[in-house]
Amino acid sequence: METFEISDFKEHAKKKSMWAGALNKVTISGLMGVFTEDEDLMALPIHRDHCPALLKIFDELIVNATDHERACHNKTKKVTYIKISFDKGVFSCENDGPGIPIVKHEQASLIAKRDVYVPEVASCYFLAGTNINKAKDCIKGGTNGVGLKLAMVHSQWAILTTADGAQKYVQHINQRLDNIEPPTITPSREMFTRIELMPVYQELGYAQPLSETEQADLSAWIYLRACQCAAYVGKGTTIYYNDKPCSTSSVMALAKMYTLVTAPNSTIYTTTIKADAKPYSLHPLQVAAVVSPKFKKFEHVSIINGVNCVKGEHVTFLKKAINEMVVKKFQQTVKDKNRKTTLRDSCSNIFVVIVGSIPGIEWTGQRKDELSIAENVFKTHYSIPSSFLTSMTRSIVDILLQSISKKDNHKQIDVDKYTRARNAGGKKAQDCMLLAAEGDSALSLLRAGLTLGKSNPSGPSFDFCGMISLGGVIMNACKKVTNITTDSGETIMVRNEQLTNNKVLQGIVQVLGLDFNCHYKTQEERAKLRYGCIVACVDQDLDGCGKILGLLLAYFHLFWPQLIVHGFVKRLLTPLIRVYEKGNTVPVEFYYEQEFDAWAKKQTSLANHTVKYYKGLAAHDTHEVKSMFKHFDKMVYTFTLDDSAKELFHIYFGGESELRKRELCTGVVPLTETQTQSIHSVRRIPCSLHLQVDTKAYKLDAIERQIPNFLDGMTRARRKILAGGLKCFASNNRERKVFQFGGYVADHMFYHHGDMSLNTSIIKAAQYYPGSSHLYPVFIGIGSFGSRHLGGKDAGSPRYISVQLASEFIKTMFPAEDSWLLPYVFEDGQRAEPEYYVPVLPLAIMEYGANPSEGWKYTTWARQLEDILALVRAYIDKNNPKHELLHYAIDHKITVLPLRPSNYNFKGHLKRFGQYYYSYGTYVVSEQRNMITITELPLRVPTVAYIESIKKSSNRMAFIEEIVDYSSSETIEILVKLKPNSLSRIIEEFKETEEQNSIENFLRLRNCLHSHLNFVKPKGGIIEFNSYYEILYAWLPYRRDLYQKRLMRERAVLKLRIIMETAIVRYINESADLNLSHYEDEKEAGRILSEHGFPPLNQSLITSPEFATIEELNQKALQGCYTYILSLQARELLIAAKTRRVEKIKKMQARLDKVEQLLQESPFPGASVWLEEIDAVEKAIIKGRNTQWKFH
């Protein structure tokens, strides 16, 4: 039983950090040095490595003294001095005024079985003192009645001396409270209390005795606390440190002391913050604020109730008030609505000192130095004088404007991955070009080309070519600048700190020798540059051309548009496609897909050609690099600046998302053959053309990667995963590791955005837990795929977890017959995934989702499956009693049938108020146990994130003692233990409203199911829906028309197959008369078959029509030959074989008759097929839900 050790309070306090803080040295943030001005200016720095428990020991005695001063403030016998000293490790704190009552404590004497006096109880007995039960108007800094005892328990020895005007009490306390000597009590008229002690330094991580450095460092900290206390108690009481009075008896003096060296001669703004109701109005707060550009972040010193308060709602209240004024003034000054100042910006140049008392506060944090009080106390009762805020705001705004000025134009940085041209910056600088490579692989290609040497003597080399890496990404400079109009009307463009510190862009500026103050309109100005031009060498994919190159152009257009006008910005246009004809080693090269498409249409066949795509520069081999660099000059194209470019740069890279959204609602207009020929003939590319084609294509592609299509509710990545899954698991649905399946998708579906993001998407597609995005998982996850606890972020590594296709569900939701009718994406000339699916049910409104993209927000809340089924069936079935009503609603764009949020896997409540639904968690209140048990959270709220949000809310944690989470992945059980007497106060403070009761408000057990129904359209661009009904109404015709297309295509295929099989049967019957074996070749045999009326057919197309359209079937199927007859083997001419063919024809004819019948169905062709497929999907969903989507 040795493991079940029993420890008393004293021993526990010696060993555990929970009482006074860490018991060893740690780095403590927020420790600031102070400065004192004697004859010479003297700085007292404070190092950050200290033992919190030791500082707590000293602080407890100081706070006890200031508490006593406040308690005696309005009494006859006041505290006139507090003497603090520290010498050779011995700390002492003394104050006059009434001493501790020297009377016996009956209860303690009875327990100890000896005479115990009140001073001993106050200093040696844990959980005893005057601060345990505090009144609401109490302004004491003490909290739990353990502070002085902690000082004793961490002291080698201590001497307590107190005099109450009649007697003097002296008591020695040794060995960390283990040896308490009897007190000496003598008559005395004095009135004071003094405590001296020697901490156990060695136990707390210090030398014992203290080293000189430690002694000086601790002395500086204690001096700081003495100065703080001097400001707190004011001029009526003198604070001494080592017998020297502290001169900081006001908040102004304290602020000056802190900033004497760091911000000398700064204006100090002071004010008094008053309250309008008792008890707060009895204790105004004194505030001093120092505003200086030398401060780089907001800092504050708060001495509240004598405690050095590290944070609290009073500071937040002041910061928000300052920020509100600064934002207003800043907007009036800069006159730029797109320029936003944050709370951090507004307060980063301020040092604030707050001194005073606040009644009824709680002290939290391990060292009990974090102020906690309901935030609405300040909003309701306290007010900050407007004159103070106004005068201070003017200074803050002036500093903000200065900080974003152009004084930092020539900041020098270390430029990574830069190779200088030998002639750069010299007499031949204008003949040099800087090659800006997209990344490391592009740098390797350039280096290979520039070092060809003798094999390419007339080609480019390092003599006139430098190289620099763009690092694979460029910052959007357009969003990092602010235009400020001065009083004189001049517009100044200022860069923010992020832009000036950006290594890539600043590296380009430094390497080229660019000056932000120069416009480069004249040749004389341009001649000062270190290079004659910059050549962008980027991949031919959307990321390279559309994003990186576009951002580089935008950067130059923003600061130096004249350089583009004079041809300074160029690009290396490398071949996108090479076509090798069989037997010919010289390829045909194409730089745009439109060129290749036009060429391909003119070819009779590409069977003898090999087509290779080069979207990445790294795809070119050594031979191809040599070939390119022999004609390097011909591959360098110059950008030109046309009239419409300025507006397009603003649209695609500026801060006005509404302009960009309007532009991106339409698709890209591809380059025409005439345009590509024009570009090649002059080797010039208008910026507007690049932006309208490449940049817009990238933006639209980014949207499709982040926002789903309304037809299938899928982003491009998820669509690739589904298409890859249907292909990969088609023949064998055995489980595969996530990373293996990810590799398959990347290879077969041409995924180009990294393994990590792909594997993450696969894992999400298999997640199924309460609150997950997908109510209908695409894959069955085998292993740990994440839980509700962390919102799925706790999934296992892709190397260890596996997936298999949820085939029973997927194959019913996405019928195989649809796959031949859908439009497909072509990557590198090969068919990849469909541009969109059209599932049997509207998946876009059946699952959850949220994502932003290019100014749009996408947020959906899954709708009730039963409502969706009812609506879709009513739309299809003309015998449904609600059929006509629904069609009337669709025609008139109204709603008649419910389409409620899904409550599947959710044990809470859904309620509607106005136009929005709200989800509510559930809870059980136990007044007897003073506890609330949360049994369900609002929809899609992860457990850990929820608990963290509660803990971050100080006004809620003021009532909470402990939060314990016993939740599983399926169920919620969160125990919220309240502090004593908190329940009634919670109900009083967190008011009940129509939408939520007090407990729901307090525990944040409600969220709004607000939707942003922005989806990608089938042909690209965004469509904005106003309701889930609109999505459903838009989706229905696409699914409906698919049945007619499917049936018409099936009819065409059946007819062709019947024609072919009938011809074969006829040939078998007439083969003896035709006797084709007597003819010498197939051509002659074909002539005979033609003369006898046998149709020439394209057997391969009829047998495997796959992606052929009806038009292609009708045109090409009857333009074949007679291989289907001439390839028949002898056994296929037997009577048994003929009989089987006749039966096959009958079955096909029967199916054709059925198809013809389905095409004549009402209200539309294939209506009954759709109903059957809906039944199959519903059955699969029910089975999936009943088996946790394992289907077994």
UniProtKB/Swiss-Prot annotation:
PROSITE patterns: TOPO_IIA (PS52040), TOPOISOMERASE_II (PS00177)
Disulfide bridge positions per record: none
GO MF entries: ATP binding; DNA binding; DNA topoisomerase type II (double strand cut, ATP-hydrolyzing) activity; metal ion binding
The species this protein was found in: African swine fever virus (isolate Pig/Kenya/KEN-50/1950)
Major enzyme class: isomerase
Xref: PANTHER family: DNA TOPOISOMERASE 2, DNA TOPOISOMERASE/GYRASE
Similarity section: Belongs to the type II topoisomerase family.
Known EC number: 5.6.2.2
GO biological process, one term: DNA topological change
Site (Transition state stabilizer): R799
Pfam families with a match to the protein in the record: DNA_topoisoIV, TOPRIM_C
Keywords: ATP-binding, DNA-binding, Host cytoplasm, Isomerase, Late protein, Magnesium, Metal-binding, Nucleotide-binding, Topoisomerase
Reaction equation(s) it catalyzes: ATP-dependent breakage, passage and rejoining of double-stranded DNA
Name listed for the protein in its UniProt record: DNA topoisomerase 2
Induction description: Expressed in the early phase of the viral replicative cycle.
Active site: residue positions: Y800
Note on cofactor: Binds two Mg(2+) per subunit. The magnesium ions form salt bridges with both the protein and the DNA. Can also accept other divalent metal cations, such as Mn(2+) or Ca(2+).
GO cellular component, one term: host cell cytoplasm
Main location: host cell
Domain Topo IIA-type catalytic positions: 707-1174
